[in-house]
A protein has these predicted regions:
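Positively charged N-terminal leader segments that act as targeting/secretion signals
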Residues: 328-341, 345-354, 359, 363-367, ...
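N-terminal Rossmann-fold NAD(P) dinucleotide-binding loop
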Residues: 154-155
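N-terminal glycine-/charge-rich "phosphate-binding" loop or analogous flexible N-terminal tail
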Residues: 1-45
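C-terminal helix-to-coil terminal segments
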Residues: 1, 85, 92-105, 261-337
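Rossmann-like adenosine-cofactor binding region
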Residues: 57-60, 173-270
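Phosphate-binding beta-alpha-beta segment of Rossmann-like dinucleotide-binding domains, i.e.
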Residues: 87, 95-144, 159, 163, ...
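Short beta->alpha connector loops at strand-helix junctions that form conserved
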Residues: 28-29, 51, 72-73, 89-100, ...
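Glycine-rich Rossmann-fold phosphate-binding loop(s) that bind the pyrophosphate
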Residues: 150-151
Length: 388
């Protein structure tokens, strides 16, 4: 049997049980670098399931038996994927297990902030029934929601917001206006255009060098003074020091944050002193239903990968190998390369950038496109996600 390492606290029992049925399983007591290296090498581990643990280049370099890392969820910023690729380790993730739960959390934030829910609850608990006379909340109908990053989560948020009669805009330079219009979404041609118009701004991006700190002082000054910022992506996408100043100085009205730059936050984190911020502990996607689905898919993905079968989803750097294998066969190249042409691939960094076609093509045209792109990937070494 294949040998798999789980890390305390691990995934849901539905996933653990599936792995135990198919693999010899070991448990690491924590996710510290030295602990993982020791456990992997002592037990000749081939596959590992990760959640929030930091998986470093040193781990990949020090553990020659490790072949697969299966991330429980979509985000892989805790894993040095480039190092994994360098050492022949495939990284797997689950991009569609919890997107509905995250979208629901976005709408909860919109409603809670618009109706001053937390303040109203506090007032009633402390005998201030007259809060209803001194506080006038806002409706969300006819308000404008800007979605920054129109991936699975963003598209699901758009559907939910439309049901509340909100005006939905999106900033995503890789999706044309006509495609957005088909979803009932108005395209913001620039981020600034969207920020100027929005009453609520929700960030749905992966953390990359390009997105780190993209919401900062300049962006907050562009936003309406009545606007609310929502972040359910990754904490460092938002410059927290700049956000604190914007909120303290009433440059924007509020924020709702499921993620922070440092988790958990330090006791002296300035944002914690403000009453116009709603916090949740990075569990926007952690509904019971989503956790069950993600745990099961993570286990299935890992088992298939260890058995040499086609896997549910690879992180994009590792798809280079798959594309390269398809270079000699046009249709195989198309099958391997095109899923990430219009799925999550957003930018290519190898000294130059290029926009990738998202439009589905068929037949020989698709095969040619796939083969051409596969050959291009063979010559370039780093492809990364931008949007969720």
């Amino acid at each position: 049997k294949h040998r798999v390492l789980l890390i305390e606290p691990t995934i849901q029992p539905v996933g653990v049980d599936l792995i135990k049925e198919n693999c010899e399983t070991f448990m690491a007591p924590d996710g510290k670098e030295e602990t993982l290296i020791r456990c992997i090498n002592e037990n000749q581990i081939e596959g590992m399931v990760t959640r929030v643990e930091t998986i470093t280049r040193k781990i990949f370099k020090s553990c020659p038996t490790l072949k697969i890392v299966a991330q429980h969820g979509v985000g892989v910023d805790n894993i040095d994927v480039a190092a994994a690729t360098d050492h022949g380790v495939k990284v797997l993730n689950i991009p569609d297990g919890n997107y509905t739960s995250v979208a629901e959390h976005v709408m909860m934030f919109v409603l809670a902030s618009s109706r001053t829910l937390l303040q109203a609850d506090y007032a009633v608990r402390h005998g201030n029934w007259k809060f209803r006379e001194t506080n006038i909340p806002h409706a969300v109908a006819e308000k404008t929601l800007l979605i920054v990053g129109l991936g699975r989560i963003g598209r699901t948020v758009a559907k939910m917001a439309a049901a509340f009669d909100m005006n939905v805009m999106a900033y995503d330079p890789f999706i044309p206006a006509n495609k957005m219009a088909e979803l009932g979404i108005k395209k913001a041609e620039t981020l600034d255009d969207g920020l100027k118009a929005a009453d609520y701004v929700t960030i749905q991006l992966h953390l990359t060098p390009e997105t780190r700190g993209m919401m900062s002082t300049e962006q907050f000054k562009i936003m309406k003074k009545s606007a609310v910022l929502l972040n359910l992506s990754r904490g460092p996408v938002v410059d927290q020091a700049a956000l604190y100043e914007a909120l303290k100085n009433h440059e924007i009205a509020g924020a709702a944050l499921d993620v922070l730059a440092s988790e958990p936050p330090a006791a002296d984190e300035p944002l914690l002193t403000l009453d116009n911020v709603i916090f949740t502990p990075h569990f926007g996607g952690d509904t019971y239903e989503a956790k069950q689905t993600v745990s099961r898919k993570t286990a299935e993905n890992l088992i298939k990968a260890l058995d040499g079968e086609d896997t549910y989803n690879w992180v994009i750097e590792n798809k280079i190998e798959a594309a390269e294998k398809g270079c000699g066969d046009k249709r195989k190249g198309a099958a391997q390369a095109t899923p990430f042409l219009y799925e999550k691939a957003r930018s290519l960094r190898a000294g130059k950038r290029c926009f990738l076609a998202r439009r589905r093509q068929k037949g020989r045209g698709l095969a040619a496109l796939g083969a051409h792109f596969a050959q291009f990937i063979c010559k370039n070494t780093l492809l990364h996600f931008l949007l969720i």
